[in-house]
């Protein structure tokens, strides 16, 4: 009887895309994919060396245990099962809020899915090398497949983010990490399209929520691989369906384009550890700060600051009152603006920590209170337009003596593909992060190897092995 009930169409569409779509041979998407993979691994190395807090989450659940042929966690000597390995790499990529971002009605970070993809591929590759009896037909476990998996995961998450505001229903955006990672990892594990439909059928905190979602995606794939079936209509069921109680059964999800390779070509690279909607505001503040200094004034001379922002920025990162921790601070537009004025340069992860001189600064608190925000419809429209995908902020500064520093408008901050500085700064970011643990020769070799489509994933991951940096407390 249940065999006659079709799976929900969005689930069928995702499975068909993952299994049947061929990425165009144009090098653009693959070039971007190589870039986001290196950027994400660079972010992982940065976290290892800058966040002792994140390192407490790393390593086997039971200290001292090992997993045969497991995933080698980059930057450490840990060898982990694919589920814990996905979580740990997800923590390292995401924790300092320095990994890439993608905007729309929902904001998210498609690179979160790479933790699942890399962990699963490395584990399968090492297991395959030690067994000649497996009957499962995996796709080739090479750099080329890694690139294809990344492009498809980015596309699934990116397309769903454009016009579907999960946050409006109190749902964490990492649900899309689970969706994209489960879909792609089921293909990597050699499952059929029908099995993928079960694997992608899922129903989800700042530093580790995406890691948890990616980990759950791998776990769901393993359950499906073992024969568990997914529900066929979690979206459309008349009583309990997700769409019935959220976006509406008739409206459904809004997908303005078919799945292809668009998202990977429109990703926003994070060149500073700061919630993405605040980056253009930081750049505007740096410009205004230089103007302020050039005319002989200081921050204490500011009467108030007027901001024109997108609706998304106002909703997600406008905060008044006390900020309780680092995650609270790097997700506060008033904090990052004040920080830019006080510091005079891009923020660093350390600027958000409890022991930072800015975290308990009266000057910081006073300046935050002087920032007035107004949602601007034109900036919001540009942000939501899939052809423009701007992330704009307009900033006007008023001084106590009546002087007005004319508005500085930043629509395409560094990190946006339309900003000519992005490519160079992206490369600098990667090299800076990697130098925390690797020599220039090793970094050059890693960059060379990402261009080798036929290289086994395990060989690539081996390039990142280092002594353990985790400090497990469990």
Curated annotation (Swiss-Prot):
Gene: tstI
Gene3D superfamilies registered for this protein in UniProt: 2-methylcitrate dehydratase PrpD
UniProt protein name: Alkylcitrate dehydratase phiI
Application of this enzyme or protein: Phomoidrides A and B (also known as CP-225,917 and CP-263,114) are potent inhibitors of Ras farnesyltransferase and squalene synthase. CP-225,917 and CP-263,114 inhibit Ras farnesyl transferase from rat brain with IC(50) values of 6 uM and 20 uoM, respectively. CP-225,917 inhibits squalene synthase with an IC(50) value of 43 uM and CP-263,114 with an IC(50) of 160 uM.
Source species: Talaromyces stipitatus (strain ATCC 10500 / CBS 375.48 / QM 6759 / NRRL 1006) (Penicillium stipitatum)
Entry function: Alkylcitrate dehydratasee; part of the gene cluster that mediates the biosynthesis of the antihypercholesterolemic agents phomoidrides which are dimeric anhydrides. Within the pathway, the alkylcitrate synthase (ACS) tstiJ and the alkylcitrate dehydratase (ACDH) tstI produce the decarboxylated monomeric anhydrides by coupling the C12-fatty acyl product from phiA with oxalacetic acid. The pathway begins with the highly reducing polyketide synthase tstA that catalyzes the formation of a C12-fatty acyl-ACP, starting from one acetate and 5 malonate units.
Listed GO CC annotations: mitochondrion
Coiled-coil regions listed in the entry: none
Keywords, ordered alphabetically: Lyase
């Amino acid at each position: 009887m249940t065999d006659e009930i079709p799976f929900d169409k969005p689930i069928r569409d995702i499975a068909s895309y993952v299994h049947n779509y061929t990425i165009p041979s144009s090098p653009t998407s693959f070039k971007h994919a190589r870039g986001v993979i290196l950027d994400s691994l660079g972010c992982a190395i940065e976290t290892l060396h800058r966040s002792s807090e994140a390192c407490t989450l790393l390593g086997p659940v039971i200290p001292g245990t090992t997993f045969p042929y497991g995933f080698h966690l980059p930057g450490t000597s840990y060898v982990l099962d694919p589920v814990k390995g996905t979580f740990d790499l997800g923590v390292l990529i995401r924790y300092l809020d320095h990994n890439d971002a993608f905007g729309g009605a929902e904001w998210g970070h498609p690179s979160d899915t790479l933790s699942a993809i890399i962990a699963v591929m490395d584990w399968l590759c090492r297991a395959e090398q030690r067994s000649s009896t497996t009957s499962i037909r995996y796709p080739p476990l090479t750099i080329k497949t890694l690139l294809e998996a990344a492009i498809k995961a980015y596309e699934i998450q990116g397309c769903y983010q454009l016009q579907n505001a999960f946050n409006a229903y109190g749902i964490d955006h990492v649900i899309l990490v689970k969706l994209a990672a489960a879909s792609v990892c089921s293909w990597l594990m050699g499952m059929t399209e029908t099995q993928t439909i079960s694997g992608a059928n899922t129903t989800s905190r700042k530093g580790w929520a995406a890691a948890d979602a990616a980990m759950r995606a791998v776990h769901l794939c393993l359950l499906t691989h073992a024969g568990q079936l997914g529900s066929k209509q979690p979206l459309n069921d008349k009583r309990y369906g997700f769409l019935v109680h959220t976006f509406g059964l008739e409206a459904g999800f809004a997908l303005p384009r078919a799945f292809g390779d668009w998202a990977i070509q429109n990703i926003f690279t994070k060149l500073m550890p700061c919630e993405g909607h605040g980056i253009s505001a930081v750049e505007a503040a740096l410009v205004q700060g230089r103007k302020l200094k050039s005319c002989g004034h200081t921050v204490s001379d500011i009467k108030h600051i007027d901001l024109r922002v997108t609706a998304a920025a106002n909703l997600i990162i406008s905060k008044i009152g006390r900020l309780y921790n680092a995650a609270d601070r790097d997700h506060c537009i008033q904090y990052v603006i004040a920080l830019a004025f006080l510091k005079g340069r891009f923020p660093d992860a350390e600027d958000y920590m409890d022991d930072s001189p800015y975290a308990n600064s009266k000057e910081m608190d006073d300046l935050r209170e002087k920032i007035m925000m107004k949602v601007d419809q034109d900036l919001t429209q540009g942000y939501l337009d899939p052809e423009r995908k701007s992330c704009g902020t307009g900033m006007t500064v008023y001084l106590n003596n009546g002087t007005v520093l004319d508005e500085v408008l930043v629509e395409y901050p560094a990190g946006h593909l339309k900003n000519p500085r992005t490519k160079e700064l992206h490369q600098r970011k990667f090299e800076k992060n990697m130098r925390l643990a690797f020599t220039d020769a090793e970094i050059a070799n890693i960059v060379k190897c990402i261009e080798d489509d036929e290289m086994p994933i395990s060989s690539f991951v081996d390039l990142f092995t280092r002594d353990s940096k985790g400090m497990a407390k469990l």
